[in-house]
Amino acid sequence: MSLRKPLEATPGAFGGLDTDSPSCRPLDTVTVHVQGRARGDERCTVRVCDPDQQPYFEQELELRDNQGSLQFLAAGPLGNHYIYVTFPGESYHSRYLNFHLDCETAVESGDSDFDPLYPFTRDRMLLGRREYETPRGRFVGYISADTLHLDGIWLRDWIYGLPAYKYWELDMQCGLDRFIEAQHENGMIPDGIERNGGTWRAWVESDVEYIMTLGVWQTWKVTGDDAWMAGALPALERALAYVQRDERVWDPGHQLVKRQHSCDTWDFDIDSAGDLGGGRHVIANCDQSGYYVAFRAMGEMYAHLGRTDEAEAWTRKAEAYRQRAVELLWDGTKFLHHVHLDEIDHDGFDETGQLTMGNTWAMTRGLASPEQARSIIDEYRRRHAETGDAYPWWSLQPGYPDELGYWSAPFLKQGAYANGGLMPWVGGELCRAALLNGREDYGVELLRQWAEHLRRTGGAHVWYWPDGEPGFRTTNEVPYAGWGMGEWTAALVEGLAGITDSGGQMRTVQVNPRWAAAGVAEVRTTVRYAANRAYFAYRLRTDRRAATLRLDFTGSGEQARFAVLLPRGWQPTRVSLDERPVEFKAVSVDASVYVAFGSGIAGAQAVIIECETD
């Protein structure tokens, strides 16, 4: 016996709703198919809401033969989104359907130099990820690629890989907790922690406390864990106070950090002296850029917590520190390697001519002005052409001559390791600095060189000889140096793709796409923190015939500030956002022209930039 089914209780009474896929990425085109009700409908309204039920797309759809389709760009917060269909005469929707919005960090330009860089880096760096159960608790970190501490984590190598691992790592805080727990009573931070919980400190170094500060600051900006950050601030206060009172690392005359005589930021003295920081002091440019940005970071963290007095004090301290450092170390072309505080005779070798790795930090950390940065970049280009070395990634250029007899170890000869060897992290910082300071063409050239290096060699060692051959010093050398690959990731994501998280968790994003310098006409870029759902995504298309650019964007945040690099010879004449004109400025960075404007982030938005050409 067949049952009689009331039409009112069947799909036909409610209509049909479907999409082309149950999941998608931000700025994907979603196609919605609507089947009208059995009674027949001429139109309906389609509304799309994000996971918080906030609508970001709504359109009336005309139905023909009781069917219709439309498209929209998926946008807004990650998670399950809602599509609602409402037919005429209804006060409540007739049908609804979810689709899932998710994404990972990716660059999709169609250029074989750029697109593989991020996945290659992620896959190789994950080989150096370590997860320990120490006596104090769980520790997650990333190894040094050449250390004798095979089962330990150097703070510096780990944190200097953060510009890359912040996009995929889920557990970013526990390792920093272990370092805070191991802080000495006087405020000093250890250099590293072993699997068994033991610690070590290289006494030559004066940078560990600023690295710790940067680690907490950058991790907090990713995770958004205000309570954790506030809990770490007292430890950072003690660490930075220690630096400013210990006579081994503070020069009261110049009011700047000092260190025992070393090769820039590295952890050994000339002559392998072991006086535990008691003499042979210098003020090195590498330390000054680090403490300048660490003081700024303290100001930003206190400001976020509403502690205005502390924030302003640290901000004033940072700027005064920068001024003292620049006045002492800038030589008119570059920053000096260091200034001697104790008399050291280098037997006629002139250190003032050395171009040191710390100069790249001076540019990316803001110690150098834009004009000073361009001077340094041009000096790198000049020396690279002059030397013919494989890459301009020098630790020192030139290194200390072997005739001085400072080191007997083969890996410390001139042109090796930190005495003139080529270090990928230096190249990455130089590349990002070039992209940020009006030398975009050179930055693209460097990034393409790096891509070719990875294709040819399959990885990144800690250092190379000037001819490009990998340099070895321990049995623990592996070709996945996070302190190196991380800096090139920043050059790709923040430099070329131009996405920088200004406010933490991508609430406020600075978006400076520089694809015009690479000749890329169409690109899609997504940046996402795996530890949460913070992300930003854009599509950029350049129409050279019409002299226009179209920028579609979305994200999880609130505000975006744009400065889009224009092709050579273009000048902006009009900028519209969702077909409404917006205020803009043409900003010159040396010979480069950017068009700058701002916008809130709400759903999928489209910017059209119209230009005139020479």
Q: Residue spans of the language-model regions?
A:
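Aromatic-rich carbohydrate-recognition surfaces in CAZymes
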Residues: 151-259, 284-292, 352, 356, ...
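Extended acidic/polar, glycine-enriched regions
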Residues: 51-109, 601-603
